[in-house]
Amino acid sequence: MSVISIVPLVSKPCLYKSFISSTHEPKALRRPISTVGLCRRAKSVTASMSMSSSTALSDDGVQRRIGNHHSNLWDDNFIQSLSSPYGASSYAERAERLIGEVKEIFNRISMANGELVSHVDDLLQHLSMVDNVERLGIDRHFQTEIKVSLDYVYSYWSEKGIGPGRDIVCADLNTTALGFRVLRLHGYTVFPDVFEQFKDQMGRIACSANQTERQISSILNLFRASLIAFPWEKVMEEAEIFSTAYLKEALQTIPVSSLSREIQYVLDYRWHSDLPRLETRTYIDILRENATNETLDMKTEKLLELAKVEFNIFNSLQQNELKCVSRWWKESGSPDLTFIRHRQVEFYTLVSGIDMEPKRSTFRINFVKICHFVTILDDMYDTFGTMDELRLFTAAVKRWDKSATECLPEYMKGVYIDLYETVNELAREAYKSQGRDTLNYARQALEDYLGSYLKEAEWISTGYIPTFEEYLENGKVSSAHRIATLQPILMLDVPFPPHVLQEIDFPSKFNDLAGSILRLRGDTRCYQNDRARGEEASCISCYMKDNPGSTEKEALNHINGMIEKRIKELNWELLKPDKNVPISSKKHAFNISRGLHHFYKYRDGYTVANSETRNLVIKTVLEPVPM
């Protein structure tokens, strides 16, 4: 039976206090959000414009635009009925035992004469262990062991790459490609010139006509390596083109298997739109299939056993956190705002998909809160609010005082108070982690965000289509990447002194790229529906205005090229050598970008959350993996 078809049980008490301080318990608004939204009587809603958009008469007698978004998919009663046996101490004890056994495996392959060590493939063993624990989502337990392994591999790295073992003189493509990727992601300096030697006289990667599993795996690792290229690395661009074509052809010829499923997954999600938890779930399923076919070695079997236990332990925590998110949403009065998209479960799925560290509940819970308000503001500025109302709300946020509600229409008052209290609450939480007041950062980000939205609302009301440059400059901010990232990361157990924050927040290159990628990718997925709602300005329409005679297809091709270029630039911003701003300080902001990108893989996965996004919720949050 599908998990979605289960009849919800009686609501259970929130278990939030069992894993986080009671001071963080979600609480209801002091004043529930006003029910002045759409009239609940069906006869009061008069459709017009198009199937994807309509106008409706609100309770205050104003004809308003609405988006006709589908309703919340996840009833609170259903969420409160979720239960999992994997929170029991016996599973934690089992995980600790397995962690010790995996550490022992790491130690044995690090011994010069260890029983598992062969000088013929020791480098590949180290790299495979690191790659496996990371893909299986259990690497947090083995940071010391990972560094020892990578230091060892790097000591044998040369300008010609490496072979599978330290005694192998000739480099091979598989080990070199895997090593390049893993080493670069961990901050080691490696150059793509190592791949030049694998080219034939025609300048193409040399490979035999026979598509053996070993050769296919080598090209798969080459493809994975090509995804973390920097903008100027021509050889990596060539490697990506070649490996993409090779793997697509291989899928047409090899039988359906765990290898074909792995190839399809990597081709589909690449790296910048991949969610770590979805990758973990997928890789667990692939290894489970190999285990059934008795093709796993002893080391990988042990890793798989630990990964399944860890996945399900975190799954239990996810469900507890999700209950609190749903309770907060319900008690806040948000369900009465019938003109907005209710996507709190989807936001939680995103954030728990990029951070599986159990102790970071505060980060995950508050990310959902911020994104929930982003959605309210998005729908308010895009459709429901009148221009006069939106100007009043924007001015009230600049005042940042509860008394500012006096000048607001009734339905905005509750939104403003809840936004005010939540942003202040998150700033107090951030103070505990950062040891300084960060409220001004948050307020400035919010003001900039609403300013960009007010400008877009003005464009909608007047039918104005700006130049592409003007549109994108504003769209970097209205994409909401900055506001969704800034306050949540400040609640992590990671220090963000001013010199580090300025490399991630506005106006840094990192922030600029992440915001523009999200805006460009979002528009390619949303522009047709937005246009049907009367929102003419998009990166597609602006490009076509700037380039008379161009077609939508040409505009999309140009924009997709811009996205790919910016992705490589963002790779550099994340991975560039910088002793003052380590990769670890930028990783969460980068992963938020990956998560947001993921939801636009096939469509606007927030607005239309009843297809791929629904399946993602089930696969990564609601269902455990079979033990």
Curated annotation (Swiss-Prot):
Family named by the database record: Belongs to the terpene synthase family. Tpsd subfamily.
UniProt cross-references to CDD domains, sorted A to Z: Terpene_cyclase_plant_C1
UniProt pathway: Terpene metabolism; oleoresin biosynthesis
PANTHER family xref list: OS04G0344100 PROTEIN-RELATED (PTHR31225)
Positions of Mg(2+) 2 binding: 378, 382
Reaction(s) catalysed (UniProt annotation): (2E)-geranyl diphosphate = (+)-car-3-ene + diphosphate
Record note on domains: The Asp-Asp-Xaa-Xaa-Asp/Glu (DDXXD/E) motif is important for the catalytic activity, presumably through binding to Mg(2+).
Sequence motif DDXXD motif, residues: 378-382
EC number: 4.2.3.107
One term of GO molecular function: magnesium ion binding
Protein's organism: Picea engelmannii x Picea glauca
Residues the record lists as binding Mg(2+) 1: 378, 382
Single GO cellular component term: chloroplast
Stretch forming the transit peptide: 1-46
Protein name: (+)-3-carene synthase 1, chloroplastic
Location(s), subcellular: Plastid, Chloroplast
Cofactor note: Binds 3 Mg(2+) or Mn(2+) ions per subunit.
Residue positions binding Mg(2+) 3: 530
InterPro entries (UniProt xref): Isoprenoid_synthase_dom_sf (IPR008949), Terpene_cyclase-like_1_C (IPR034741), Terpene_cyclase_plant_C1 (IPR044814), Terpene_synth_N (IPR001906), Terpene_synth_N_sf (IPR036965), Terpene_synthase-like (IPR050148), Terpene_synthase_metal-bd (IPR005630), Terpenoid_cyclase/PrenylTrfase (IPR008930)
Keyword Magnesium assigned: yes
Needed co-factor(s): Mg(2+); Mn(2+)
First-listed, main subcellular location of the protein, grouped into a coarse class: plastid
